[in-house]
Amino acid sequence: MEAEVWEAEGYNLVLDSDLYDADGYDVPDPGLLTEKNELTFTEPSQVLPFLTSSQQWQSLTPRARARRLWLLLRTSLHEVVEKEKRAELRAARLTHGLEPLRRLEVAAGLRSVAQDPVGGRFVVLDGAGRLHLHKEDGWAQETLLAPVRLTGLVTVLGPLGAVGRFVGWGPAGLAILRPNLSLLWLSEQGVGRAPGWAPTCCLPVPDLRLLLVAEMNSSLALWQFRSGGRRLVLRGSALHPPPSPTGRLMRLAVAPVPPHHVLRCFAAYGSAVLTFDLHAWTLVDVRRDLHKTTISDLAYCEEVEAMVTASRDSTVKVWEADWQIRMVFVGHTGPVTAMTVLPNTTLVLSASQDGTLRTWDLQAAAQVGEVALGFWGQDKLSRRVGRLLAPVRPGWPVLSLCASSMQLWRVRELYSPLAQLPAKVLHVQVAPALPAPAHQSLPTRLVCACADGSVYLLSAATGRIVSSLLLEPEDCAAAVAYCLPREALWLLTRAGHLVRANAARCPMSVLHRVCPPPPPAPQPCCLHLYSHLTDLEGAFSSWEIVRQHWGELRCSSVACAWKNKNRYLPVVGHTDGTLSVLEWLSSKTVFQTEAHSPGPVVAIASTWNSIVSSGGDLTVKMWRVFPYAEESLSLLRTFSCCYPAVALCALGRRVTAGFEDPDSATYGLVQFGLGDSPRLDHRPQDDPTDHITGLCCCPTLKLYACSSLDCTVRIWTAENRLLRLLQLNGAPQALAFCSNSGDLVLALGSRLCLVSHRLYLPTSYLVKKMCRKAPDVVDDPPLPLMSQESLTSAQLQRLTNLHGAASLSEALSLIHRRRATSQHLVPKEDLDAIVARDRDLQQLRLGLVVPAAQPPPSWQQRQEGFDNYLRLIYGSGLLGMQSGRGSQQWSAGTLRVERETRDVCAVPQAAHCLARAEVSTAAQTVPTALSPQDLGALGQHFSQSPRVTVPIPPTHRRVHSKASQLLARSSLSHYLGISLDLQLQLEQLRGRTTMALDLPSSHLQCRIPLLPKRWDKEPLSSLRGFFPATVQPHKHCLRPICFPGYVPNSAVLQQMWLNAEPGASQDALWLWRPRPSQTQWQRKLLQWMGEKPGEEGEEDKKEEEEEKEDEELDWALASLSPHSNQQLDSWELEDQSAVDWTQEPRRRSCKVARTHPHPWHRHGSLLLDEHYGHLPKFLHFFIYQTWFKKLFPIFSLQAYPEAGTIEGLASLLVALLEKTTWVDRVHILQVLLRLLPNMSSDLQGQLQGLLVHLLNLDQPPSLQDQTQKKFVILALQLLLACSLESRDVVLELMSYFLYSPVHCRPELKKLLHGLGLQDPEGFLFKEMMTWVQGPDLDSKAGLRTCCHQKLEDMIQELQETPSQTSVVSGAPTRASVIPSGTSWSASGIFGRLSQVSEVPLMVVSPAEPHSLAPELQAQRMLAPKRSWGTPQLRLRVLSETLKSFCLEPEARLHPAGPAQLPGEPPPLEETDWSHSQLLDLGPIDALNFFCEQLRAQQRSSLQEKAAHPHPPEPYTVAPVPDMVVPPPREHWYHPILRLQEAKPQRSARSAMRLRGPMRSRLCAGRTLDGPIRTLKLPLPRVEPQPFPLDWPMPPRPLPPRLLQPALQRYFLPADADPDTYS
């Protein structure tokens, strides 16, 4: 065996033999130390003569001899080190993808290769029976003789291969070899062998302890490892696939099959793929003609869960789990002979007879690499690859096996993904410019300009998008400049527009746009920002000020910022060759100079004190910058060039210029130096071969980098010498150094990729980098979404797409401290209102809608608007107070209190007692006085709770006017400290009790003195009149009222509106309000419809009022002061497992009241909310649930960012539904029932399919187990709500009826009756028992399929049945019914009544007639009976149906959690959404129609039995009738066909009606599908209507007699269907 080595020493780099020789790198090492007063050898040639002189050597002492030998060794070692350095500094080419590593020749022919990752080797079996051992990199170790004659060898991985590492096969049978390749076990002669048994390939399955053996006769045998892998036992008999002329088992693969991910074996068999069940050991599937010709290889890709096949038709195909084609790779020009999948990637390698080895990316659906198989120069026959072996461990090579050789390919990844942007990236910059200081205070960001006109700021450490500027595609950037300390972004478009944006917001806002002057005036064509950054602390303080004010500096801040020493000068180049320096704020030109006239300015770059520019005059000029002067540019030096410089980069006193001349295909890099520094060039063959797309430098390492369209990145030294050539699999559009370590950021299409410095830097540079302190990584999170009104629909769509294009960054060495999380730039909820607004504007712009004049508001609308106005200011407590609309007398009377609080500690009741008041002439007393603890809690600025020494007795005094009450309850009065209750209580406590109130001085200073002259003289309780008139706004107090929207034309709100836009946290205080009770509207509706509420209604009214009061108490507790975390934790532990959250709301509230009578428990629940205030409100209900903690042990929005929205939380729970236990599934379904109204239709469809799958598993949930039974009931509710139709639920109930035991069937019948089934006799269930029998009852999925087919026949029969009157009651054609429990607004009720009364729908279930008003019940009784043939739908309110499927209170689960949480979502059946959704009950109509048919048949049979008192004995032949009786009236006008006119198809109704042997024969398929050719009767034509209309009816039924000869014209064959003649 011969080995050809293609690697270099040290870094194993592929050398370019014609690049540099070693002579150019003979630089002495300054680290070599010389010893003083010691003899040294400057040249090694002096050593040999000295040692050969024996007399002189013998004259030396042993110590001197040892010293001389040590000096010789030291000098030689230094030479070796220098040689290694020179070799490492030579130019080397690094390729992304496959690199040729080594080729091994096998003279005796290659048979098989087995990779041993445990031993770090691979074993090669040749045709002579020898085993060659090689290291993982291909170096030969030793050669052994095989213990038995073998033709193949495979490795057993995992613990199973600890004793028997290899399995071989050959003429002697199967053999197990030890790790030292000695024989451990050999199969016996004749065991498992048949004629032509010789194996062709083997595949171990260590997880199942199995071995698959493909044999020559196209059979597949299964062996099992026994005794810890020491022997094999044949399991079952060999399986033979279907015969095929070209079929032969070529390749085997094992892959998991959904949904249970059970391992199956897949075998390539000609152009088909066979699937074998390893557990049952059967052939379960055959997929034919997947390719045009023979399938040569197949493999499974776990990353995309797809099967990949390669064929000799030159294609590679990717298949879904159900063998639906996903994609086809067409690129090879010859037959594909081998294929493999790289582990833990989406990359597929394929080898073809066209001489190429190609790499395909399944995720990108494209070819990403190609290498030539003839790299080593062998002929086509010898380089034909028969097998590809993927690496078994990271760092191992890919093996391509040929007939007599083996090739090793190194898999190298030069870059890793950093971020994914929505469009192609054109420009990449780093801000602030390198080098970064050691103590980094500012974050490092990447500025990316895309082809769609957008610009993105990304964190260089994590790849997350910080902010974005969304412009149109016509504003595509020609150049960008970004100033991080000022958060300003400059953009020069290709049209010449100069745009300045505020980068402190997300999305960025355009501050101003400077349009170019009209031609022929010079146009701006180049942009650069010079940063004179000398004061890092000043830059950081300026950045913090800008971020604090969202980019808008105040005058004082601007003056302070101008005092620092940092300066930022925007420089613009024009087409006439001039350079302009712009003023920072106005973008006006403050200085202009000629630079490259008459040509345009091409490129601009800068260093710490100079600017470099190049232009069309073929010159490169360096300018000295004076940042503090008005004339800021002064020319230093001019360099003449032969070609225009398209790229510039300045580093110290040197300038690197990239030249291009496309006409002569000239592309090169040249370095210029100042003063006497020479110009540095390199060899022409080192230059790029295409357009230079980027040029940058790393000042710390003094390295340059340039990118080109020839798919290369070149690294250059400070002496302009090529150091590394990175060959990529795509053309980079831009690049930039992003750290002092030398990490590179590339733009490949729309992806940002990171090239680590460790991949290409030599050791000397790595040592230099290690000697420097790495800068600190500053956290740079994404900015929150600020402004939304100015966004267009296209920008919204881009933000929505960006929401899905999450960050792809991974944890990288040194600069990546943590793994980048998925980015959610814009929550989807923030865009709904904007998308709806923009859609309306777009329709208006296109003329699809016409604006109509708004009618004047009615009196009711004005009153409702005024109530909403007051409610917005004074809160939800105003809902229980009459406003006195008619008189508008605000102070004409006093307030009558509905109830008085009796608990002294009940803070919410005392705080909100004034909300339950009505205008009255009788004076009442005020509620119980507040305790000092409550006063301390109500004070917003109290630092701690007051200390009480004496209890306070209740006091009685007069109350203030109504307006004073309202103002006292407003948040404005509460913030300013003028709440009347608080003032009065403090007044009384000051005179009658002894207490210590620790009021901070800031709180006392901010309080508004109310009538300071009377503060110590007259108590506030004696004040009368309109109290708000005595209040004056404080000049230094912030206006606290923050509304979620804008309320125009309000004199009151103008005094309370904030200048700044309220944040999301302030909006939440207004948006989180207890929903007012809607019982009043329902009661008014019933009264309007004529029904008087009874005693039950009065009780409901009281319960609703109590529930409403509890909700108001919750709102009052929102202002209580927080307690310590220890007390919060004690309350949480105290509340564990205290309340059943699945009970009814009223019952649950009562239980909470009984369990926690002390009001501080409710205070603790609000503290829980405050403790987790950073989480969304809807998560507060789940965060303490035991099952939720079990599923998410460490829950946070950082770990689960998708849980920040209801849609994301629901999708997360749906994904966990299939993997968890039945108990957790019940909890998840209960949560999904509450979240369903806020779920999207796509997610609802996904949930519906998953539930159907779980209900029809091989082991479906059993109704005998209580937990699984709860799951079934909840799943049925979700199926109803997701689909809004009853088909799936009816099928599940029918299949469960057949599948479940007998004692479970009554409850299933009850559920079907709850859906509207009208079958008191049980006809349907008796008929269902005849559908299946025996083994068919064991599979619920099969039962569901049978029920589905029967139900479809019933529905088709219902649709085909002509209009006929049914006696089914309770099916009115028109009904205007409002179901009980529905709570709508007044306007919504009138609209729904008008809509329902006009649509012929059935809304009410017959099972609940008591929910109707008397008038509606009368209307229902008088409604006409339903005509089955009419195309009407039977609908029903969803909430009514869900109530019949609700779990009993004792059957619900009891999740552990706190006793009271404010964010509990209501049950689905109690939501407005369920009251507004209508459920389609079409399948129930079909079942009812079927039952009615059976009922009619029973009645007819009973009538016949009554007419024939002596029926014939069973099992006797009935006499043949001898008379013709008139048919029933419903068949009179149907034609009677002749015998030769039988219908070609049998209807479903006939199969239902037939009984006995005739039905069995018809069901078996023996129906009349054509003319009856066995009867030849010379009969006359049959009249369509043989009986005239006036034919008399027989007075009584006559006994059957023989047919008279005159009437013998009608016959009924035995196998005919009577219904086909009707």
UniProtKB/Swiss-Prot annotation:
SUPFAM superfamilies: Tricorn protease domain 2, WD40 repeat-like. Gene3D superfamilies: YVTN repeat-like/Quinoprotein amine dehydrogenase (2.130.10.10). The gene is WDR97. Signal peptide: none annotated. Residues 1094-1118 form a coiled coil. Keywords: Coiled coil, Repeat, WD repeat. Residues 1096-1112 have a biased composition (Acidic residues). Residues 1090-1112, 1453-1472 are annotated as: Disordered. This is WD repeat-containing protein 97. InterPro entries: WD40/YVTN_repeat-like_dom_sf (IPR015943), WD40_repeat_CS (IPR019775), WD40_repeat_dom_sf (IPR036322), WD40_rpt (IPR001680). It holds the Pfam family WD40. WD repeats lie at residues 187-233, 290-329, 331-370, 552-592, 594-633, 687-726.
